[in-house]
Amino acid sequence: LENALNYAVQEHHVAARSVGIVMEVNTGAVLAMATTPAYDPNQPRVIADKAARAAVDALSGKERATALQLAQQTQWRNKAVSDLYEPGSVFKLITCAAALDAGAITRRSTFYCGDSISVAGTRFHCANHKRHGSQTVTQALENSCNQSFIQIGARLGKEAFCDYFAAFGLREPT
């Protein structure tokens, strides 16, 4: 898992830390968990992340001490279980799989991402406020495009969405 995670981080130019979890699909038991960059528990005070280490080394005095402490605490934290995440971007994979399976979309379907999209009087933007323009399902996933996934969810419909929610076992305790 660590090797696959390191490869994915390098291949996709991930700037922040990343996390991977492998679970037993029938029981939900955690089989493996990894975060990158990892640190050497035999040298826990050595900052493993090269960029973080360079940023700390560029400082001096109290600023350096504060930055060093923050960098150490960041690398020690198990991101998989300690950080909070909004479920939206993670759930985009489930929304996509459900819509493809239901025939609500195909791999060739396209979606438009402009300034914003309105749902029930609330305007939604992409998290980085980029306008992706016309994009395929694959591009919408790559961009984690909020507007495209609002459109995909609308095509799927709320009843089918709820049915797939149950089909994926998301109403069952883990």
Predicted features by range, described:
Residues S18-V90, I94-T174:
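Beta-lactam-recognizing serine transpeptidase/beta-lactamase-like catalytic domain environment
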